[in-house]
């Protein structure tokens, strides 16, 4: 028996994760002082509308170690795989690792592995789907190196249709975005660091 746990950087719908037996651990998003939890109760239409209209920075909070630990404890008798958004983009991976450490102290024989997908969104989803394929006929000891190899040999590319939210959150300067009024393609590679991301961005602009 196994259990796959993922933060909500994964793009699988709530219906799909239920069908596949995956457990989501949600991010929290704050817009104009109102906090939204990325779970089954999130009104996506309302959320996207407010995100588009606000002129203020949008704040996010990653899952806490306790959020992960609750699900781990409920499934401690299973092979556990936890997948997170890139550790370079969020503290979700660190939270999961803290929960893993606490679980190992509480459950001596637990089989648990935290996977830094080194990606987000579609790249994260691809790793989840690959993991689902691996667990069908491989043992925990075989799955772990196989999925890590998959992650380390992957590259994610993505397109930004708008830089509006990057500007609002202080990621890029408005003056820079005005000079480059096109869709921007980014390449997100293994071991990419935030500093390097900005250096590439500055070269583009």
Predicted segments with their positions:
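A general structural motif
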Residues: 1, 77-79, 109
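N-terminal glycine-rich anion-binding loop in soluble enzyme alpha/beta folds
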Residues: 3-67
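Mixed-charge interfacial surface used for oligomerization/domain docking
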Residues: 10-17, 22-23, 92, 97-101, ...
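Secondary-structure boundary/capping motif
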Residues: 39, 60, 91-92, 123
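Residues that form generic nucleotide/phosphate-binding pockets
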Residues: 50, 71, 146, 150
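Active-site cofactor/cluster-binding pocket
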Residues: 63-79, 84-104
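Short glycine-rich or small-residue beta-strand-to-loop segments that form or flank ligand, phosphate
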Residues: 79-86, 113-116, 130
